[in-house]
């Protein structure tokens, strides 16, 4: 029995080390040892039965029964010790086998957990890499940090307090802004209209000033119809004619004062009519003036140049022939 226990211990050490043989060979050795120990236990039972029969016969046949009793006691004690030892060896073998199996199970569980952990780590790395790649491709929707709301129109009034009041205030602010923008646009248009009106007014005033500067009393009485025509022509041209003869003309012609006053009244009335027509026309054409100002300027300059040329070619009126 002691040899069996020693051999089993050696087998257990070999299983723990696994240095000399493979796992299958060790398992075969363990099964053989276990079967041998079970056979020894069966043989022990038969030996005990045979010993009991022998002592029974000896006790009945021998005269010295005391000696037979002592031998029986010694044999029974030895047999009991051997059986206990044998049963202890078997229990040790069984417990060692169970412990080995549990150790193997623990080792396999540890290996499985390590493999599972490695798989989780690799999956996490793959997920991070995939997220980093997808984040460069997908354009995430942008919302305000404090107001990330679900879809739908009914979510806004429930999420924001006093939503109706805020909406009314927003509409009022938009209306006020529209009113202010319209007022600013009207002021800008008025500012743009003022220089154009002043231009037309200056152009319209130029003939009246020229007519006032040229007095009809300096002209001879025989040519009353001619000065009116010239005055009309001069009222159409914006550049006043300043000739030394008109300035140096003599003033002592009293009989023609009434005629000159009537001519002046007619000129003033015609000038007022022209000014009124010019102002109404300027008010109508203010919107189109920004586009037509360069063309009008060119035409105006051409007309001025042509009139100056025509006036240079005309003969100067001689006022000294009457004297």
UniProtKB/Swiss-Prot annotation:
Residues 295-310 have a biased composition (Basic residues). The keyword Oxidoreductase does not apply. Residues 281-294 have a biased composition (Basic and acidic residues). Residues 185-323 are annotated as: Disordered. Residues 243-268 have a biased composition (Polar residues). GO terms for cellular component: cytoplasm; cytoskeleton. The keyword Nucleotide-binding does not apply. InterPro entries: ABI. Involved in regulation of actin and microtubule organization. Part of a WAVE complex that activates the Arp2/3 complex. Binds SCAR. This is Putative protein ABIL2. It comes from Oryza sativa subsp. japonica.
